[in-house]
Amino acid sequence: MASTVSDGKVFNLLFAGVGGQGVLLGAEITALAAVSEGYDVKQTEVHGVSQRGGSVETHVRFGARVWSPVVTPGKADLVVGLEVLEALRFAHFANLREGLILVNQHEIIPGSVKNAEQDYPHGSVEFMRSRGYRVLPLEASRLARDLGDARMANVVMIGAASTVLPLPHDAWLETLHRRIPERFRQSNLEAFAAGREAACDVEALRAPRPERS
């Protein structure tokens, strides 16, 4: 078991995004990597109105002993938002003192906005920071698209998350090898590496206004 987490420490992680973004896969890979290191792991998920296009959140908790799969508000060590507005929606789960919010700088416009019922709320990263949250925005969708498939943005974000989670690099690579089908494996390993590099690159964190789809 990794020595960076004490026997009494439980690490709390929340993935949030829109159905179809690979939120569940991101959480599953994280959970499997933790299991491979001998941690007790609990995971749960919540879907929105529709499985594709609706809000999706997944909680992952790991430590020497974990009793509940649910992360309570204000207790998450890491929130991974695969979409800007979803990151804002679940920001209150982050620990204000020690937590981190990773945000994919990508906007998925909901139907209500497309139908002109309301405006998409821009400035989410700035708003979260104004409330005291530590936020790192990443251009995960662009990085994934540059690698040939924007759908790998979730793996880019996993790569970024791996730089702050107390799990060794080899555990992530071994999990990706086991979980990703062979024909997609190399491209996903490249996406994972791109996420790690971006998370460590200060300039990469100065992302422009989120793109729209």
Regions found by a protein language model. Name each.
Residues 2-213:
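Active-site cofactor/cluster-binding pocket
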